Amino acid sequence: VQSLERVFLISGHSNDSRAKAPDYFAIFARMEKKTEIPVSGRQIVMSGIRPTGYLHLGNYFGALRNYVRMQEQYDCYFMVADWHSLTTHPDTKELKNSVLRVLAENIAAGIDPSKACLYVQSHIPEIAELYLVLNMLAYKGELEKTSTFKEKVRLQPENVNAGLLTYPVLQAADILIHRARYVPVGKDQQQHLEMARNFAQRFNHRYGDLFQEPEAFNFGEELVKVPSLDGAGKMSKSENQFATLYLADDDDLIRKKVMKAKTDTGPTVKNSVKPPEIENIFQLMSLVSTEETVKKFDADYGNCTIRYGDLKKQLAEDMVKFISPIREKAENIYHDTRFLAQVVEQGSAKARKSAKATIELVRQRMGFNYF
């Protein structure tokens, strides 16, 4: 119990990383009460993240920030997809640390385990059973045509395993095991969601109605794409690591990365359009800086008096103020293995109750209830 009191604030953000610890007794009391899946009438949302690296600013603004809001309005199932990681990272030596790190960073970013079901994929064996069933409804030709499979074959020709080919089938099992209504996905995963809809349709047609067809969660204008610091696309784990700001980066590394952000020689015509690399910096600033700060530098750019060194210094300090509280909270949570074990235990209990109910219905529809 004492170790729980050392963990910092798990939801919301405060620039005071030494903020008073929350009442973890109350948190776990709420978690205990919600072990039974509530019949709330709320729509179910399911999403997962692979434990293949630290979370970055793009993960936060592109997903986590919205997840924090969603947990107040939906029954949310947020999964650490450790089985999925094996398709590209078969060495499991660091898997435990990676899973714990992702859990800690999710909680530090605001996911409340007393409100959302936070669990690990491999702790829910019913997913594997549904995966097997759905594989009988998937076809080699359609799986080989998926853009992500073709891209992985190009990137890792020495390891084209069956897990890569059937990756969309496992994703479908992740979603359908909870009979989720909404799935927050990026454009790169839209094809996989459509396949999940197809598998649901095929099951319903062959064995009887069971699954609703999952839909992409529409964030509308709230969906944010965070640009990389080198001006080449969005922040990503797989691209230029020095152009990506991680939630685990220390203050000096944040400053170093931001100061190396790509710029041009500066504007020479008043009120000219910003080139992409400069627009990227302003977009990043709009995420973490005050409105007054953004307006000040925007005006400087418009009248050709902007100094990029000052712009990047300001952005660096604002990034430090934003990231450092999350990093410090995540570090404390990560090292409190007792707390994380309790979170996973509670999340697994909720997720398994939902999964078992679905699998029982699957077996009934398919006629596996022989006696």
Where are these regions (language model features)?
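N-terminal Rossmann-like or analogous alpha/beta NTP/dinucleotide-binding catalytic cores
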Residues: E32-A173, R327, E331
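Conserved nucleotide- and phosphate/pyrophosphate-binding catalytic cores
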Residues: Q191, R197-F371
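Divalent metal-coordination and catalytic microenvironments
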Residues: N106, L134, D188, A232, ...
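Internal, conserved structured core segments that host functional sites
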Residues: R154-F203, Y207, P227
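Short helix-capping/linker segments at secondary-structure and domain boundaries
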Residues: K140-E144, I177-P184, S289-F297, R327
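Short, positively charged and aromatic/hydrophobic N-terminal segments
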Residues: D23-R30
